[in-house]
Curated annotation (Swiss-Prot):
One of its GO terms (biological process) is translation. It holds the Pfam family KH_2. PROSITE patterns: KH_TYPE_2, RIBOSOMAL_S3. Part of the 30S ribosomal subunit. Forms a tight complex with proteins S10 and S14. Binds the lower part of the 30S subunit head. Binds mRNA in the 70S ribosome, positioning it for translation. This is Small ribosomal subunit protein uS3. GO terms for cellular component: cytosolic small ribosomal subunit. The lineage of its organism: Bacteria, Bacillati, Bacillota, Bacilli, Bacillales.
Length: 218
């Protein structure tokens, strides 16, 4: 089962948290569509800003949005001009008061979404799929990952028949719930069609039990 299911979804409530944090009764569908619109708009507008994920919280008529990015300067802009323009655009999109927080990602090579996007951009620039994957795996392992696996699917090298090729290094224990595994997908638009990119990064185990810590402290 661990081999098939989305590793992030499997760990929600165990070591991962939800990216949308709100409760709704009859308005659930409306809020869900609004979240999708917000994420799609931010993804398009900040496509070059290395945005990893967008967290959304709601309270009454207010929406708090947290943007995780490796390039905060590009999102904020000179004197905060870009983030203010983004806030106004999201205000009109949702019809609610929007507050935006920017969080910087210190190590981009340990973030699965940024790694997948980077491989996809290289494929669009006609870099060999083998070279793109191997170089990125080396960078991720040097950044401190305990294991990484990448997969590219589609008409690789312009072949007539689509196939998948994956490369891995270290260990990626998909079944271990306490294993901090980051997973993401991306797409590359090439002259031969779309190529799909998947990335798994094992960053070590989390959830050290309190009892062990207390015993160690004694």
């Amino acid at each position: 089962m661990g081999q098939k299911v989305n590793p992030v979804g499997l760990r929600i409530g165990v070591i991962r948290d939800w990216e949308s944090k709100w409760y709704a009764g009859k308005d659930y569908a409306d809020f869900l569509h609004e979240d999708l619109k917000i994420r799609e708009y931010i993804s398009k507008r900040l496509s070059d800003a290395s945005v990893s994920k967008v967290e959304i919280e709601r309270a009454a008529n207010r929406v708090n949005i947290t943007i995780h990015t490796a390039k905060p300067g590009m999102v904020i802009g000179k004197g905060g001009s870009e983030v203010e323009a983004l806030r106004k655009a999201l205000n009109s999109l949702t019809g609610k008061r929007v507050h935006i927080n920017i969080l910087e990602i210190k190590r981009a090579d340990l973030d699965a979404q940024l790694v997948a996007d980077n491989i996809a951009r290289q494929l669009e620039n006609r870099v060999s799929f083998r070279r793109a994957q191997k170089q990125q795996i080396q960078r991720t392992m040097r950044a401190g990952a305990q294991g990484v696996k990448t997969m590219v699917s589609g008409r690789l090298g312009g072949a007539d028949i689509a196939r998948s090729e994956y490369y891995s290094e270290g260990t990626v224990p998909l079944h271990t719930l306490r294993a901090d595994i980051d997973y993401a997908t991306s797409e590359a638009d090439t002259t031969y069609g779309k190529l799909g990119v998947k990335v798994w990064i094992y960053r070590g185990e989390v959830l050290p039990t309190k009892k062990k810590n207390e015993e160690g402290g004694k």
